[in-house]
A protein has these predicted regions:
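Hydrophobic packing residues within well-ordered alpha-helices of enzyme cores
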Residues: 1, 59, 78-79, 135, ...
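Structural signal for conserved beta-strand scaffold positions within catalytic alpha/beta enzyme cores
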Residues: 9, 68, 88, 96-99, ...
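A short alpha->loop->secondary-structure connector
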Residues: 3, 60-64, 86-88, 141-147
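Short, glycine-/small-residue-rich phosphate/pyrophosphate-handling segment
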Residues: 79-101
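Class I S-adenosyl-L-methionine
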Residues: 1-72, 169-172
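Glycine-rich, charge-decorated loop segments at or immediately adjacent to ligand/cofactor-binding or catalytic sites
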Residues: 76-83, 161-164
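A contiguous loop/helix-start segment that scaffolds small-molecule binding in enzyme catalytic cores
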Residues: 23, 33-39, 51, 57, ...
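A short acidic, often aromatic-flanked loop/helix-cap motif at beta-alpha or helix-coil junctions
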Residues: 13-18, 74-75, 103-105, 158-160
Length: 176
């Protein structure tokens, strides 16, 4: 960025948001409406649980031009960084990316546990460590073997990345 660029940190960590998403949306609209060139940097792909869609709607409704530069989703990048392919022609021919942290205001879960447990080879749950007990319980209850290999990866692609190789049946206890 240029020396005179204004930089606003709006990063988020679990239960620690420096700015709420509606406020981020308003800030993007405000700065763009003032004629400023706004660059919103995000980790991963802004359209995979990255709130890019929400930001785009706000900018569209305000009649402001914008563009997105695709990123590499952490759903693949983190697994790759740990040396784990999400597909492999001899082992896994499909994968799904699922939120591990559904919006608590929507009430009932909309995750298709039976479909995920039996119809998809590799399951990638993002933001799921805090809900790991619920995730593994639902997978096993819907037909996924407790002996299925699993990896729990925290702080993906960062120097402090930690990868735990475990099973679906023991993952929650192993992380606790």
């Amino acid at each position: 960025a240029k020396d005179d660029a204004e930089m606003v940190y709006v990063g988020k960590a679990s239960a620690n948001h420096t700015m709420r998403q509606p406020d981020i949306n308003k800030l993007l609209v405000k700065l763009a409406a003032e004629g400023k060139t706004v660059a919103r940097l995000k980790g991963g792909d802004p359209f995979v649980f990255g709130r890019g869609g929400e930001e785009a709607i706000e900018l569209l409704e305000a009649g402001l031009p914008f563009e997105f530069v695709p990123g590499v989703t952490s759903a693949i990048a983190v697994a790759e960084y740990a040396g784990i392919p999400v597909t492999h022609r001899h082992v896994a021919t499909s994968f799904a990316v699922i939120t591990g942290h559904e919006d608590p205001t929507k009430g009932e879960s909309t995750i298709n546990w039976s479909g995920l447990a039996t119809a998809v080879d590799t399951l990638v749950f993002l933001m799921g460590v805090e809900n790991l007990t619920n995730i593994t319980k639902n997978l096993i209850a819907n037909g996924r073997s407790a002996d299925t290999p699993a990896a729990v990866i925290r702080w993906g692609t960062k120097p402090e990345q930690r990868t735990l190789i475990t099973t679906v049946g023991t993952a929650a206890a192993d992380v606790a």
